């Protein structure tokens, strides 16, 4: 699941690498137009579930419908500090499958690490690509 889908590139990458289904959520109508166009260009629309909702509402709906995820990718706009709340809701609603992972893309790795200290997650990898930092998380024990 790509919670802040933007162009849909991450969800499309998941699908191109064999994921059975990719949820791509973004609250921006403009972003969703790009996601739809990009998914059509790649001919992967059959397995793409595109949702135009705020992340909080989408996570609530996923819980209500019993949907769980193996991989959850979070790349909220860098100027919004909402990863901590998204992770909190994902854990609270039990949306991560056993052995599932959360990947956070951020421009401020130290802030995200500090934010995650209160969760039941452990950082098992992190990588830096230019300005972007990727933090890979899994539930402890």
Kindly give the residue locations of the regions a language model identified.
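Class I S-adenosyl-L-methionine-dependent methyltransferase catalytic core
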Residues: 1-141
């Amino acid at each position: 699941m790509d919670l802040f889908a933007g162009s849909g590139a991450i969800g499309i990458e998941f699908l191109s690498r064999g994921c059975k289904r990719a949820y791509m959520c973004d609250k921006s109508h403009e972003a969703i137009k790009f996601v739809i166009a990009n998914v059509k260009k790649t001919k992967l629309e059959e397995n793409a579930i595109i949702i135009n909702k705020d992340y909080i509402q989408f996570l609530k709906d996923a819980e209500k419908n019993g949907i769980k995820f193996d991989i959850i990718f979070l790349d909220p706009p860098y100027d919004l500090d909402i990863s901590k709340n998204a992770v909190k809701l994902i854990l609270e609603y039990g949306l991560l499958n056993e052995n599932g992972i959360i990947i956070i893309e951020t421009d401020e790795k130290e802030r995200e690490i500090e934010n995650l200290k209160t969760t039941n997650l452990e950082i098992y990898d992190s990588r830096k690509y230019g300005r972007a930092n990727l933090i890979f998380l899994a539930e402890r024990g």
